[in-house]
């Protein structure tokens, strides 16, 4: 009897270990249910909370430049408040809660994408580093200083060229709008005062057909849809290419120095142009246009 009781107790203990959800205890014909939290439930709760590793993965998947451009467009400067960064991360769907937004902000700060200091977010940490270097000069190689100075001169020249090209494009577009308004006014005058609709109907028809033919010819020559956005981009690149050539701007040298200092074009005037007109422009486009 003692051995049978021992076997029963051993079997019961094994059953308790094998059960992942409940343990049944028999005592005096009564049974009580005790719930045990399984490891799978703990894993599900952990999955609901964002971790630093998951936030880093999100940072790699999300286009951080779009987020920075949105912040620059809202604040119109290089510094925004910490609450603005949290609201932007939640508004873009990066974070689902304020806690996740705080974690994502710390990841951006650790990665060097932004600089968080005293409830302020600096969107261009490289500019802060330049200011600190000017205030506290470090021991640098004279050759490195010369290269840095050369890069700053080329960057300033590039910004001036971009702004000038954008102004010329805007003037051309406004002239095109004025020409269209004059054409409509002329047709209106000829239709109701000088001639009649019977005379002007074929003229307006051929004028409209000419516009369609011009758009189709644009598609054949460029292999792109004849949209106003694409036309504006090509016009900007054309003016930029001419200005780069007239100012004798060394594009290859600029790209080399840009890669050397690991800086992106978001620091240049092209970023503000993208924010205003929505054009995705890069110096590679101008280089490709020059090769063509």
UniProtKB/Swiss-Prot annotation:
Tissue expression: Mainly expressed in roots.
GO MF annotation list: calcium channel activity; metal ion binding
Organelle transit peptide: 1-18
Catalytic activity: Ca(2+)(in) = Ca(2+)(out)
Span of the annotated motif Selectivity filter: 197-205
Disruption phenotype: Altered root length and mitochondrial ultrastructure.
Primary location class: mitochondrion
One GO BP annotation of this record: mitochondrial calcium ion homeostasis
Transmembrane domains' residue ranges: 172-192, 202-222
UniProt entry keywords in alphabetical sequence: Calcium, Calcium channel, Calcium transport, Ion channel, Ion transport, Membrane, Metal-binding, Mitochondrion, Mitochondrion inner membrane, Transit peptide, Transmembrane, Transmembrane helix, Transport
Presence of keyword Mitochondrion: yes
Family: Belongs to the MCU (TC 1.A.77) family.
Purpose of the protein: Mitochondrial inner membrane calcium uniporter that mediates calcium uptake into mitochondria. Constitutes a pore-forming and calcium-conducting subunit. Mitochondrial calcium homeostasis plays key roles in cellular physiology and regulates cell bioenergetics, cytoplasmic calcium signals and activation of cell death pathways.
Identification of the protein by name: Calcium uniporter protein 1, mitochondrial
Gene this protein is translated from: MCU1
């Amino acid at each position: 009897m003692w051995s049978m009781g021992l076997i029963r107790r051993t079997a019961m203990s094994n059953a308790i270990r094998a059960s992942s959800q409940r343990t049944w205890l028999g005592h005096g014909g009564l049974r009580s249910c005790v719930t045990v939290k399984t490891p799978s439930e703990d894993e599900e709760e952990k999955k609901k909370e964002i971790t630093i590793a998951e936030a880093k993965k999100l940072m790699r998947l999300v286009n951080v430049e779009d987020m920075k451009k949105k912040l620059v467009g809202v604040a119109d400067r290089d510094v925004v408040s910490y609450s603005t960064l949290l609201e932007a991360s939640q508004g873009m769907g990066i974070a689902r809660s304020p806690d996740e937004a705080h974690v994502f902000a710390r990841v951006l700060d650790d990665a060097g994408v932004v600089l968080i200091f005293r409830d302020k977010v600096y969107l261009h940490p490289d500019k802060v580093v330049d200011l600190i270097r000017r205030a506290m000069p470090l021991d640098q190689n004279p050759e490195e200083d010369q290269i840095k100075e050369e890069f700053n001169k080329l960057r300033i020249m590039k910004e001036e060229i971009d702004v000038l090209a954008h102004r010329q494009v805007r003037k051309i577009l406004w002239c095109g709008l004025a020409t269209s308004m004059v054409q409509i006014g002329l047709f209106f005058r000829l239709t109701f005062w000088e001639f009649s609709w019977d005379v002007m109907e074929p003229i307006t028809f051929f004028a409209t057909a000419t516009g369609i033919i011009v758009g189709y010819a644009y598609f054949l020559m460029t292999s792109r849809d004849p949209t106003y956005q694409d036309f504006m981009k090509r016009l900007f690149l054309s003016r930029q290419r001419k200005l780069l050539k007239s100012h004798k701007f060394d594009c290859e040298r600029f790209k080399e120095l840009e890669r050397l200092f690991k800086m992106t074009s978001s620091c240049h005037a092209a970023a503000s142009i993208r924010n205003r007109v929505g054009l995705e422009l890069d110096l590679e486009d101008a280089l490709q246009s020059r090769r063509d």
